[in-house]
Amino acid sequence: MSSHHNDKATFLERLIFNNRPAVIVICLLVSIFLFWQATLIRPSTSFEKMIPLKHPFIEKMMEHRNDLANLGNTVRISVEAKDGDIFSKEYMETLRQINDEVFYISGVDRSGLKSLWSPSVRWTEVTEEGFAGGEVIPQSYNGSPQSLDQLRNNVLKSGQVGRLVANDFKSSIVDIPLLESYPDPQDQGKLLALDYRKFSHELEDKIRDKFEAQNPNVKIHIVGFAKKVGDLIDGLVMVVMFFGIAFVITLILLLWFTNCLRSTVAVLSTTLVAVIWQLGLMHFFGFGLDPYSMLVPFLIFAIGISHGVQKINGIALQSSEADNALTAARRTFRQLFLPGMIAILADAVGFITLLIIDIGVIRELAIGASIGVAVIVFTNLILLPVAISYVGISKRAIAKSKKDAHREHPFWRLLSKFASAKVAPVSILLALVAFGGGLWYSQNLKIGDLDQGAPELRPDSRYNKDNNFIISNYSTSSDVLVVMVKTKAEGCSRYEAMAPIDQLMWKMQNTEGVQSAISLVTVSKQMIKGMNEGNLKWETLSRNPDVLNNSIARADGLYNNNCSLAPVLVFLNDHKAETLDRAVHAVQDLSLIHISEPTRRRG
């Protein structure tokens, strides 16, 4: 190296290249440690991480979480009879076995488990002697034709058609509320967090696979947040496979671009080191892989390859004038380290801004991406030039790089004319027109999901097919808007509170995109009608406090312990942005009209 270049060498350059063996050894030791850490990282997420906890609606949900125990994280299993309907001995036996099997799966809130076999699912009717009722499946059920006829009558009188039983009577649902944490079977004093991947696999192995094989006339459909997240985590295997494909494609393209196997291997190796460091540091700092952060390694790989190619190209150009690979690597480091550092810092700032989004998985994605671009500084801006200073670049690659540097490509020559003095004003005008057009068209941009089901999964995925089945055959979907009507203690049964709830339900049931709505008013009207010999004229709210109090006695789960909160369950066709906007605006518009001191509506 000439004295001219020695004079330009910075302290950082001298520190790195005068201690190349130490740099290699340190990076090797760090890589071994972080590789071990990376092997320990596991898929991990939770219900709370997937939602914006500071959103006013979510804050109210968390505030009344104990009052809404069965309205949060739930899974629904629909058991379909392929031939015939549910009123057969074989089907009901399979449903009973599924109900029992689900009961013992870890993480299930067993007190809230509901199906036709649950004692809490009852029927009621009005007779000459008064009210009659009982369990939908009585203790005397034995699978005989007479028992099945009685079961059919009980289902029709239970009000569960469209809820637990499909509208066409060809399937029924097992409703499974989940616990975010549950006692360890081995140590009851210790709480275990719900493992979504394990839970999803148990549903597949113990429910779907087992009972579809046991009864060929049965088909299982499973929906719910936990199942969706489990399917997303299972996609990690596919992600790893695609990462391998991307690696091979990148290898081929780099070989074609550089004509040098040594430099190609160096770029790929240092970039893989960056990915390993990123995963290792994520585990070291206590993070896991969720359905979003599992995509960060792709991003780090792409950024690392981009910076690596710039380094290799620069070293190849310098190698045509330098005495050896070390000199070329030092000159390239001197020229490209600062621009590369600025580019990486810009990337990091962009990812850090995602931290303002108050959703756990998005924040972890931002942290993971920021860690990833930070390690690229060490692996691709420092380690790569040091590695190339040892292995060098082939003469073919140097000759090709020199030739490409002096060759004018027709396309780039044409493109450069847009920056000439004559054409530049036109270029600016076109850019302004494109900006204005984009700004105008962006007003039509939809916020939220545009399709039914889980947009994170393919439209033809098993989960989305199951979701479509339930939407098509039931009046209650997995997309539920819960409107919390809050009153003073023991006030939810007052006419002043129930009348606005009744109006809210009517408004929601006549809103596009709403399947149905249920509240304590639904039960109250049915009971008042029943107490008046089943006369439909009496299916309305009474102003008599004693009548209202008695009418909600069986409205289990539709008001809290001190009757200060009454949820209205609004079942939606889907969770598209338009559907949610219409439903929320309908609630808010009615709240502005009817809000009063004893009653408050909270989304």
Question: What positions do the PLM features span?
Answer:
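Hydrophobic transmembrane alpha-helices and their membrane-interface caps
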Residues: 263-311
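Helix-loop junctions and hydrophobic alpha-helical segments within the transmembrane domains
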Residues: 318-345
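Alpha-helical transmembrane segments of integral membrane proteins
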Residues: 27-34, 246-254, 270, 274, ...
